[in-house]
Amino acid sequence: MALQIPSLLLSAAVVVLMVLSSPRTEGGNSERHFVVQFKGECYYTNGTQRIRLVTRYIYNREEYVRYDSDVGEYRAVTELGRPDAEYWNSQPEILERTRAEVDTACRHNYEGPETSTSLRRLEQPNVAISLSRTEALNHHNTLVCSVTDFYPAKIKVRWFRNGQEETVGVSSTQLIRNGDWTFQVLVMLEMTPHQGEVYTCHVEHPSLKSPITVEWRAQSESARSKMLSGIGGCVLGVIFLGLGLFIRHRSQKGPRGPPPAGLLQ
């Protein structure tokens, strides 16, 4: 990918070289250095396509004129920059070229040549449901939907009970930054679970082709114990079945050795 440099940056660099290479005044005992600087800054808003370009012109460490793409024209920062700002704003070609540098410089350098449609990194969320307290059925409780490690920040999390959206008793934390550009959020639902009810956390995010749905089913302790016992029994059954087949296979092979003498005649 070729790095694009705003055209006015090259002009500023030429000015710097001309100023620094100017001959020393004859008869002077010391040199005076004048430095003109140009800074091009691109600002990217997380999770959006919005890009802002700011170009700053600096003379001897003092900014004197600036272009801000949100403003759309040059503005003098000091009186020194007023003539330049007025002149550049009066030249349609200069303004058009500078405005285009939001795409030709900022967007180009961020996206690269392989894509022109996606400015943002996408990370799919991980979703899990937990119960805040271990309580029996028919007692007030809180379900917590943990949505973690997603980017960008825009996300929609909803709760459903038996297929119907729940809006009462729903609360959420603020978005939490993980420090690696990804986010996490907790969305809580206050409820009183009853036997057989199904609660669903429904998550929509730009990284997903279809929403993520995670279910939690209200079960009594006895039903949960029976289910776990059944799962454990199935696992043990598979283990013993495999062991029995292995032993049978080994026993069918029999000892290896030469055939009986009668078969050799």
Curated annotation (Swiss-Prot):
Single GO biological process annotation from the record: antigen processing and presentation of peptide antigen
Any GO molecular function: peptide antigen binding
Region (Beta-1) residue spans: 28-122
Compartments (UniProt record): Membrane
Coiled-coil blocks: none
Superkingdom of this protein's organism: Eukaryota
Region Connecting peptide, residue ranges: 217-226
Post-translational modification: Ubiquitinated in immature dendritic cells leading to down-regulation of MHC class II.
Signal peptide: 1-27
Tagged with keyword Transmembrane: yes
Pfam family, one: C1-set
Cytoplasmic side: 248-265
Disulphides: 42-106, 145-201
Record SMART domains: IGc1, MHC_II_beta
Ranges where the Ig-like C1-type domain occurs: 125-213
Keywords: Adaptive immunity, Disulfide bond, Glycoprotein, Immunity, Membrane, MHC II, Signal, Transmembrane, Transmembrane helix, Ubl conjugation
Extracellular compartment residues: 28-226
Glycan attachment points: 46
Protein name stated in the entry: H-2 class II histocompatibility antigen, A-D beta chain
Encoding gene (name): H2-Ab1
